[in-house]
């Protein structure tokens, strides 16, 4: 099998009440809308033996990996990264909001890629995991299509992967 499914950022901070997106004033019902379709896609991929990977956007507890422009954008949106929210510190690794949503939990053995930025390839070992498994084709799904999904897609295309969104 040369294909892999990457599920981008289906975490509480984006898809649950009290998370980062909710605190920033986004309509989380729109972010939750694709969950049933992603569940179907996951089931189909798993049934066919396709490698499934999950990503989570988040930062170190000390925010040492948070670039200043991203910090300012989040602050201007009304949801400063690292500030306390109902699900813990917003977009911080190890907090409740950083966890993947219950509906889309990884199975044992499915890699979870923690990323500090928008692309799942930036500052992660994703490319190494894919190359070591002979993956050449990617199916990419998830939330914040215009941000993290597209950033990952563009990086993947630049790295020579055939991609389906």
Report residues per predicted region.
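Internal catalytic-core helix/loop-beta-alpha segment
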Residues: 90-139
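Glycine-rich anion-binding loop/nest that anchors nucleotide
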Residues: 137-148
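Hydrophobic/aromatic ligand-binding patch that stacks against planar heteroaromatic rings
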Residues: 44, 103, 129, 155-157
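Active-site acidic carboxylates
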Residues: 1-107
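Hydrophobic beta-strand scaffold residues
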Residues: 52, 163-165
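Glycine-centered short loops/turns at secondary-structure junctions
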Residues: 47-50, 134, 160
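Short Gly/Thr/Asp-enriched flexible loops that form oxyanion-binding sites at enzyme active sites
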Residues: 149-159
């Amino acid at each position: 099998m040369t294909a892999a499914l990457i599920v981008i950022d289906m975490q509480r901070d984006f898809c649950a009440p009290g998370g980062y997106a909710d605190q920033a004033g986004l309509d989380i019902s729109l972010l939750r809308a694709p969950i049933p379709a992603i569940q179907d896609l996951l089931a189909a991929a798993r049934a066919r033996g396709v490698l499934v990977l999950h990503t989570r956007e988040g930062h170190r507890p000390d925010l040492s990996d948070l670039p200043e422009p991203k910090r300012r954008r989040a602050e201007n949106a009304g949801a400063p990264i690292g500030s306390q929210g109902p699900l813990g510190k917003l977009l911080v690794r190890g907090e409740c909001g950083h966890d993947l949503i219950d509906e889309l939990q990884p199975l044992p053995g499915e890699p979870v890629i923690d990323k500090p930025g928008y692309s799942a390839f930036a500052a992660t070992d994703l490319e190494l995991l894919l190359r070591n498994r002979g993956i050449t084709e990617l199916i990419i799904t998830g939330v914040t299509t215009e941000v993290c999904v597209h950033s990952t897609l563009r990086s993947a295309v630049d790295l020579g992967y055939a991609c389906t969104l």
